[in-house]
Amino acid sequence: MAINLTALKPNVVSTDLTGYITYLYGQPKTGKTTLATQMPGALLLALEPGYHALPGVIAQDVTSWSEMRQVCRELKKPEVKEMFKSVVVDTVDIASDYCKKYICSQHGIEDLADAGYGKGYTWFKDEFNDVFRTLSQLGYAVVFIGHDKEIVSEDGKSKIIRPALNNSTRTVIAGMADVYGYAHQKEVGQMSVLTLRCSDGSIECGSRFKYLDEEIPMNYKALTEAVGRAINKEAAEHDNKFITNERITPVPKAEILDYDALMAEFQTLAGELMTKSSSNGIKITSIVERYLGKGKKASEATPDQVEMLNLIILEMRDLNK
């Protein structure tokens, strides 16, 4: 794509959640998944059981990062984009664990910290961003659902509620969010609320919209209305020029991948592609290095890297069509 800066126009902000990333974390049974699946055209990516009590929900079980990558590929298809407008990740805690395991397997390490100098978490951040920011850029509203935990502040004088992720992971995921809220009940038996701002710092939350309400009822309508009010208030500072109400566009078993079968299929596909055109050699190398690393060959893939090998095969199948 040729870059032409003279063709650029001011960004137009949508007052619904299209293209935004929302992170809802909190106590169990506070309506997080219910709120998220109230969004138009919602696809629930279920990484843990619990959606069976939600009538009408459309859910896809996800049991590995390889499957998450496959879902992302599917969501790029025009016919799939016609079906879904929102993607709900329940829970982001498990998704991040799958991503870390994938990265460790890809680089032959046991833990992200083993890479040294923070490289492991950089790889994790890049991989996680690549999947979910891509969906956001495609026009999907992305919602992360997560658990909460309570910690003691550094000075030991107060308690802080925050997501149950470790510090590095939490920083990556919270940093992606346009809206970052805590779901809870103020009193037992009361309706749940969503805290979006907290002046005393006792609850981790926030937003890119500076006029967003501090607290709202725990439902989709209240959230979209709050975002709309915040955007319109900020838009008034710019004479309302850049605002639109339109959209800018049982426990599952993990799939068992057959390493030997995938290696055999790689050889078959590589042979067919090279027979069609010798120029496919560069394309095959590019696909392999994308998943195994620069300078790596498919023949060097170990059984522990079977997820990466599967993704290589999927792309080669597309290339061979």
Predicted segments with their positions:
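Short, well-ordered beta-strand core segments
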Residues: 42-44, 142, 179-182
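Long, low-complexity, intrinsically disordered polar/charged segments
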Residues: 75-117, 230-242
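Conserved P-loop
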Residues: 6-7, 12-89, 93-98, 254
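Interfaces that engage single-stranded nucleic acids at replication/repair/recombination sites
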Residues: 2-3, 15, 30, 39, ...
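P-loop NTPase motor core
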Residues: 94-171
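Surface-exposed alpha-helical segments enriched in charged/polar residues
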Residues: 73, 77, 130-133, 271
